[in-house]
Amino acid sequence: AIMAVQATATVMGALGFTNHVVAQIIALILVVVLAAGSGILGFEAIMKVQTWITWATAVLTIVYLVLVAPTIDFAVLSSRPSAPLTAVLGAGCMLLVGFGFGWINAAADYSRYLPRAASTKGVVGWTTVGAALPTVILVFFGILLVGSADESLSEAIGGDPIGALTTLLPTWFLIPFALVAILGLIGGIVMDIYSSGLSLLATGVPVSRPVATAIDGTIMTVGTIVVVFFADSFLTPFTAFLTTLGAVIAAWGGVMLADIALRRKDYDEPSLFTPSGRYGSVNWGAVASLIVGSLVGWGLVVNASASWLSWQGYLLGPLGGREGDWAGANIGILLAMVVGFVGYWATSAGRVRAQEKLPSRTYAQGADEGEQ
């Protein structure tokens, strides 16, 4: 939502709209109405919106790549000095959090919309290709563009990533560019708001689905207002958010991967719906692994430009401290996943084996036990 608002306001300015603050307000209202409105309307509306967004985004993205390709200068790129290992690791971990880990918690949300008859291999294969292929192409192309330009483009991207890229475009393509940028971002927002609304309902909050979706949309709006109108730049809160939340998601992902690796049978679905089932209410081994993994992750990342996160990096002493070369490597993200995986395996392997020895039950049995 933040990038969609910034991109819209920047394009409006390029087209002659001189009041940037008013442009941001108009852009915010437009994004919120389109995204939250579609999410509240429900699944059928989302599917119709997503179909058009997908095709429009694909076509306009290809046109954009063709238009800016001449600005790539391989002579300049080859003259760039090589980055140190720690910088490469840091950039790789940020990409991992921003793209790869973003699918860990979203996988179940997107999968819930698929028919039960869908092939497991097909779901995994097409999800992997659909998520990875565009990301690899666009990130690689973006590296070529930024590496070919002077430092002013990199600085501009730190404040407004998508809007900065308009400087490479002819004026006649600004409106189509705005469409591809905004529609692509809104497409993701729509799905995420709808899914997060369902997740909120799963926690037991006694509200209807549209109300739950509206709550999440409100949170999104408040966060967007804070970053767009009060933050010094986009990059500072963005990287702070990625590394801080990324450590938790990485640890949680490690727990999930360990659980998948340990199990030889499918989950007994009726038992998932009752605290008296074989899985119980809480797996304290998983909780402990998540907490310890998160703490290890936070201890090995830093956010130098975000003063409110100065407490992070408390485990970097042996690696040169918060100002050393390894401070920006973000290895805490990787180690958080390792700790989550190893911790869950060590604490829950026996528990999983015991669960799989029990006989399966019917939904009726699960419901009866839940009522008791």
At which residue positions do the language-model features occur?
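Hydrophobic transmembrane alpha-helices that form the core helical bundles
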Residues: 1-17, 186-202
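Hydrophobic alpha-helical segments and their helix-loop junctions in multi-pass secondary transporters
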Residues: 5-9, 55-80, 96-102, 141-151, ...
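Transmembrane alpha-helical segments of multi-pass small-molecule transport proteins
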Residues: 14-40, 55-66, 93-107, 179-182, ...
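Membrane-interface loop-to-helix entry segments
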Residues: 26-68, 125-127, 238-250
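Hydrophobic, small-residue-rich membrane helices and short re-entrant helix-turn-helix hairpins
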Residues: 41-54, 105-137, 152-163, 192-211, ...
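C-terminal membrane-solvent junction of multi-pass transporters and transport-like membrane proteins
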Residues: 56, 253-342, 357, 361
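Hydrophobic, membrane-embedded alpha-helices of multi-pass small-molecule transporters
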Residues: 65-71, 81-145, 169-193, 280-301
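TM-loop-TM module centered on a large, flexible mid-protein loop between adjacent transmembrane helices
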Residues: 141-189, 206, 225-244
